[in-house]
């Protein structure tokens, strides 16, 4: 009996010693743990104008490693240069005209989502050589230089004209140009001219074209109609696949973007230095233009109301303006 007890105790002691031995080979790390600490890189796209002016602090913070995410960014003169990159998965977030966001949503069958409204109205009618333009009705019989065919500028102008009994292409002609700088050069050469320009290019034109005046604020004209919608110039969209995979990173981006927009509005002198640094416009121009750029970061329910009302107005005017159908609820990203 004593022998049996001794053998049992010896066996227990041996098992205990084996359990306490540290294995020489470390335990494998699960793939999820290995990548959990890796920062998400958000690839951004913006335009040379108010959309990127609101993001310059975010760009600068990213360059200095201060953002909540890692960011890369591309700034272009036209949305047409960047929308293919978003669709092809080369960009994750892009600033585009509001109606283009709806078109992309329809064309990709829900492949993009709306994150925020980034700028409200930044469009103005400017006139050189007279004071003949006093209201929308006074545009009758005139030819206007403009950019933005097939986007917010064209549809905003079409809608405002229609509300005053005028038809674009019949009562009012437009010569569409690819970039605002072309229009500024044309107006400098002519004695009398009318154009529709966005900020900050209105300020650029005023610095280069003698006798140029701001005749109409298109946002004020829109608001005067009291139709329940707002003139939303640009918005931020993201690939739905990215939003589904990285909702927390997207929410962090919106926090960084809101802070960047606030910085531009609250510290214009400092922000304009960054606007020039990132090649958008010169600081002196940006300083005058910023207060008229209506930089915002409207998200959630407020975004849905503001952008949805604007898109409905465009849809009622011309269904093709929003891609043939009003976007459904899935279009609006309501947060992580």
Protein language model regions, located:
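Solvent-exposed, polar/charged alpha-helical surfaces in well-ordered, non-transmembrane soluble domains
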Residues: 53-61, 80, 84, 88, ...
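Short, glycine-/small- and polar/acidic-enriched structural segments
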Residues: 25-167, 174-176, 193, 199, ...
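Pocket-lining segment of extracytoplasmic ligand-binding domains
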Residues: 99-100, 181-274
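Positively charged n-region of N-terminal signal peptides that target proteins for export
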Residues: 1-11
């Amino acid at each position: 009996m004593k022998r049996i007890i001794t053998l049992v105790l010896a066996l227990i002691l041996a098992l205990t010693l084996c359990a306490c031995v540290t294995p020489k080979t470390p335990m494998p790390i699960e793939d999820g743990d290995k990548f959990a600490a890796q920062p998400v890189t958000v690839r951004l796209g913006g335009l040379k104008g108010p959309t990127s002016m609101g993001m310059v602090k975010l760009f600068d913070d990213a360059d200095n490693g201060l953002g909540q995410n890692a960011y890369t960014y591309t700034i272009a003169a036209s949305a047409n240069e960047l929308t293919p990159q978003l669709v092809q998965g080369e960009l994750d977030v892009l600033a585009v005209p509001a109606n283009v966001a709806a078109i992309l949503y329809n064309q990709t069958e829900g492949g993009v989502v709306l994150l925020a409204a980034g700028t409200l109205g930044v469009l103005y009618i400017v006139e050189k050589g007279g004071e003949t333009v006093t209201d929308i009705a006074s545009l009758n019989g005139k030819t206007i230089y403009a950019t933005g065919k097939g986007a917010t500028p064209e549809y905003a102008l079409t809608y405002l004209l229609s509300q005053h009994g005028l038809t674009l292409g019949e009562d009012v002609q437009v010569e569409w140009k690819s970039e605002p700088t072309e229009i500024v050069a044309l107006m400098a050469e002519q004695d009398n001219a009318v154009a529709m320009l966005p900020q900050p290019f209105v300020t650029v034109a005023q610095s280069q074209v003698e006798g140029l005046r701001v005749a109409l604020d298109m946002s004020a004209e829109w608001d005067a109609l009291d139709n329940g919608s707002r003139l939303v110039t640009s918005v931020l969209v993201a690939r739905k696949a990215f939003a589904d995979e990285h909702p927390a990173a997207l929410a962090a981006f919106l926090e960084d973007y809101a802070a960047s927009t606030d910085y531009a509005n609250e510290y214009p002198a400092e922000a304009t230095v960054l606007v020039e640094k990132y090649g958008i416009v010169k600081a002196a121009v940006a300083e005058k233009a910023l207060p008229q750029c209506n930089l915002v970061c409207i998200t959630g329910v407020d975004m849905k109301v503001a952008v949805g009302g604007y898109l409905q107005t465009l849809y009622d005017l011309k269904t093709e303006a929003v891609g043939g159908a009003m976007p459904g609820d899935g279009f609006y990203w309501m947060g992580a």
